[in-house]
Amino acid sequence: MDYKLELVLIPVTDVDRAKKFYLENMGFVLIVDTPIGEGQRVVQVVPPGSECAIGFGTGITSAAPGSAQGLHLVVPDIIAARAELAERGVPIGPVRHLVSGQWVDGPHPERENYQSFADIADPDGNIWLLQEVDRSKG
């Protein structure tokens, strides 16, 4: 039996601000924006090419805004993806990789999968890691 991850919730303070950031800056696609009860609203967006949605809203999680850390967005070319996101106004750190447990600027020298990263912060301080994974490499 297959088990597929459908939705990851992230805590935000301002639903409209988060929606604008994820749609306009990150380039995600809106799939749901609806009230679900008195004082509750759920928004779901999906990164291009992903089957897992990101959800946020009012009254849907008790987690503190900005407490989501280490969510990974994988891309086949981290240099191109970082440039695109920076151009769209996303606060994104430099591309870096680990050498002997220390961060070094730039992508992994051989561009090995799972080795190059860049940090992204949403308006609430939720931290994403952009990670290079080129599935065509095998």
Q: In which residue ranges do the predicted regions lie?
A:
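Vicinal oxygen chelate
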Residues: 34, 73, 82-138
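Generic signal for short, ordered secondary-structure residues
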Residues: 1, 63-64, 103-104
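Acidic di-acidic motifs
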Residues: 14, 77, 122
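Core segments of cupin and vicinal oxygen chelate
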Residues: 2-3, 9-52, 80, 87
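N-terminal beta-strand motif that seeds the catalytic metal site of vicinal oxygen chelate
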Residues: 1-19, 68-71, 129-138
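Conserved short beta-strand elements that form part of the metal-binding/catalytic scaffold
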Residues: 29-68, 75, 93-94, 112-113, ...
